[in-house]
C-alpha cells in the first residue's frame, strides 16, 4: 500500500496510517471512516469533548474512560474504540483532528478520490454542494469528496482547497487585494 511520505512524516499521519492498515486488514475501512466522521462532528459540536481531548491536566485514565463513554454513545466500532483508547493512553488525543484528516486523505487516495475542503461564509445548500462537486470532479478528472465548513469572516464567496491547490473566490480576499492595490 503506497501512502504518501508526507502523511507518514507527521505524528498524526503515522497513527492514521496504522489505523488505516488495521482497518484494511479487517475489511472495515468504511466503518472506521464513518466512525471518524461521527467523532469529528462530535468534536465540532461539543466543547466538553474538545476539552477532554486537549486538556493535559486530565489524567490518562480519565481521558480513556471519557473517550470510551463517547465511543459507546456514538456507537463506534471496536477497532475505532481501541484506537481511541490507545491515543488516550499515549496522550495523543489532542492530535485527533489531524489524525482524522490524515485518515480521510489516505482512504480517499485508496479509492481514487480527492477531498476538497470548501469554506464558505454561509452554509451551502445541498444543490449548491452537488453542483460544486460536479464541477470539481470534471476539473480534477476523478471523484471529489467535499468537506464543507463555514467561516463568516469570508464575507461571501468560497475558498476551495484540493491538496496543495487553492481556489480563493472569497470577498475577503478580493477586498484585501483591493486595499493593497490602493496603498500603492
Curated annotation (Swiss-Prot):
Q: How does it sit in the membrane?
A: Peripheral membrane protein
**Pfam name, any one:** OSCP
Q: Which InterPro entries match?
A: ATP_synth_OSCP/delta_N_sf, ATPase_OSCP/dsu
Q: State the Gene Ontology terms under molecular function.
A: proton-transporting ATP synthase activity, rotational mechanism
Keyword Hydrolase among UniProt keywords: no
One GO cellular component term noted in the UniProt record for this chain: plasma membrane
What keywords are annotated for this sequence in UniProt?
ATP synthesis, Cell inner membrane, Cell membrane, CF(1), Hydrogen ion transport, Ion transport, Membrane, Transport
Q: Where in the cell is it found?
A: Cell inner membrane
Broad class of the protein's primary localization: membrane
| Residues annotated as signal peptide | none
Q: Which domain of life is it from?
A: Bacteria
User: What job does this protein perform?
Assistant: F(1)F(0) ATP synthase produces ATP from ADP in the presence of a proton or sodium gradient. F-type ATPases consist of two structural domains, F(1) containing the extramembraneous catalytic core and F(0) containing the membrane proton channel, linked together by a central stalk and a peripheral stalk. During catalysis, ATP synthesis in the catalytic domain of F(1) is coupled via a rotary mechanism of the central stalk subunits to proton translocation.
Question: What binding partners and quaternary form does the record give?
Answer: F-type ATPases have 2 components, F(1) - the catalytic core - and F(0) - the membrane proton channel. F(1) has five subunits: alpha(3), beta(3), gamma(1), delta(1), epsilon(1). CF(0) has four main subunits: a(1), b(1), b'(1) and c(10-14). The alpha and beta chains form an alternating ring which encloses part of the gamma chain. F(1) is attached to F(0) by a central stalk formed by the gamma and epsilon chains, while a peripheral stalk is formed by the delta, b and b' chains.
Per the record, the similarity remark reads:
Belongs to the ATPase delta chain family.
The protein's name is: ATP synthase subunit delta
Amino acid at each position: 500500500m503506497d501512502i504518501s511520505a508526507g502523511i507518514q512524516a507527521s505524528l498524526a499521519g503515522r497513527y492514521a496510517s496504522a489505523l488505516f492498515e488495521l482497518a484494511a486488514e479487517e475489511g472495515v475501512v468504511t466503518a472506521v471512516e464513518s466512525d471518524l466522521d461521527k467523532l469529528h462532528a462530535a468534536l465540532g459540536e461539543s466543547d466538553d469533548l474538545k476539552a477532554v481531548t486537549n486538556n493535559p491536566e486530565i489524567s490518562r485514565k480519565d481521558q480513556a474512560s471519557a473517550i470510551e463513554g463517547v465511543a459507546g454513545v456514538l456507537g463506534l466500532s471496536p477497532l475505532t474504540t481501541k484506537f481511541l483508547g490507545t491515543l488516550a493512553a499515549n496522550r495523543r488525543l489532542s492530535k485527533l483532528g489531524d489524525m482524522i484528516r490524515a485518515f480521510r486523505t489516505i482512504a480517499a487516495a485508496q479509492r481514487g478520490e480527492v477531498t476538497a475542503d470548501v469554506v464558505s461564509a454561509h452554509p451551502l445548500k445541498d444543490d449548491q454542494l452537488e453542483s460544486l462537486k460536479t464541477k470539481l470532479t470534471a476539473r480534477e478528472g476523478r471523484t471529489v469528496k467535499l468537506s464543507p465548513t463555514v467561516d463568516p469572516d469570508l464575507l461571501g464567496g468560497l475558498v476551495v482547497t484540493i491538496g496543495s491547490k487553492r481556489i480563493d473566490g472569497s470577498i475577503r480576499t478580493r477586498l484585501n487585494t483591493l486595499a493593497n492595490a490602493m496603498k500603492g
